Every structure is written in C-alpha cells, then in structure tokens.
C-alpha cells in the first residue's frame, strides 16, 4: 500500500506502488530537513521542532515501485526516483534522476519537460507556458545544487 504520513506532495506527482516514507526517527528526536536555495549554505538543515515529519516531494516528480523516502526527505520538482531497496538520500535536487543509488542527469531536463507535458495531456490538461516558466525558474535557481549532486554521484560507486 505505501505510506506518506506527514508529507507534502506537489502536483502531478506519480508515485509507484508501495512508495513509502518514514515520518519518525528511531530515537524519537525532532527531524532536521535539508533546504537549499539562494543565500543558503549547501547542506543547510532546518530544525523542524517536530518529531513527525514525512517527505517534501516537488511537482512532476515520479517514483518507481517500492521507493523508500527517509524521514524529512526533500525531493525537488521533476525528479525521477528509482528504488534501490534502501532509503533515499535526504536531498534530491530539482531535475535529477536518482538511479542506482546516485543522482544523475538522466536523459536531461528537456526529456523531463516532455514527460510533464505527456502526464498533463493524458488527463486532458496542458502544461502552460506559465507552468514551464515556473519549472524553468526553479531549475535555474537550484542549478548549483543539481550540479554538485551530479558531480558527487559520479564519484560514488553505483549500487547493484
């Protein structure tokens, strides 16, 4: 069935069966959530002052069957997440493909935009120019986090 308790899920998100998150730390402590963006140091954690915090999943993100989100995970917009059998990283930047346990560029941002257009058209809607502009702006302001995560992924041996 899956469980996404105490989570915030964006629009047009497609969750594979049994996508699950933890919303409680094993030590019952309050949850820190990674945040990124202009004016913030990379890897900044925001203390939630709460013991029940699920995941933050951006618009147009897709997960495979059996994806496991960590407590307080932050996943950007237009991501593709492939399950590894292990909990996901706590941060996956906008536009990233998480495959084999590492963040990659995948087939690129244009393919993600095409996929978002296909998802909306399947439901008789269209991805407007304004929607595309917002997604492009999000991508632009988070580009440094994306490139850092991809670079780190290239140095990490892939999990089988």
Go through each PLM region and give its residues.
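Intrinsically disordered, low-complexity serine/proline/glycine/threonine-rich regulatory regions
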Residues: 152-160
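Glycine-rich hexapeptide-repeat left-handed beta-helix
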Residues: 1-153
């Amino acid at each position: 069935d899956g469980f996404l308790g105490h989570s915030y899920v964006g629009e047009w998100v497609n969750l594979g069966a049994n996508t699950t998150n933890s919303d409680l730390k094993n030590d019952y402590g309050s949850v820190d959530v990674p945040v990124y963006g202009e004016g913030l140091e990379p890897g900044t954690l925001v203390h939630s002052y709460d013991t029940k915090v699920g995941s933050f999943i951006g618009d147009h993100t897709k997960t495979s069957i059996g994806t496991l989100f960590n407590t307080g995970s932050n996943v950007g917009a237009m991501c593709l997440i492939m399950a590894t059998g292990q909990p996901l990283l706590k941060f996956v930047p906008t536009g990233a493909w998480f495959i084999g346990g590492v963040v990659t560029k995948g087939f690129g941002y244009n393919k993600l935009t095409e996929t978002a257009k296909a998802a909306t058209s399947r439901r008789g809607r269209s991805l407007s120019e304004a929607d595309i502009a917002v997604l492009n702006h999000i991508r632009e302001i988070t580009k440094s986090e994306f490139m850092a995560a991809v670079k780190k992924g290239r140095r990490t041996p892939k999990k089988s």
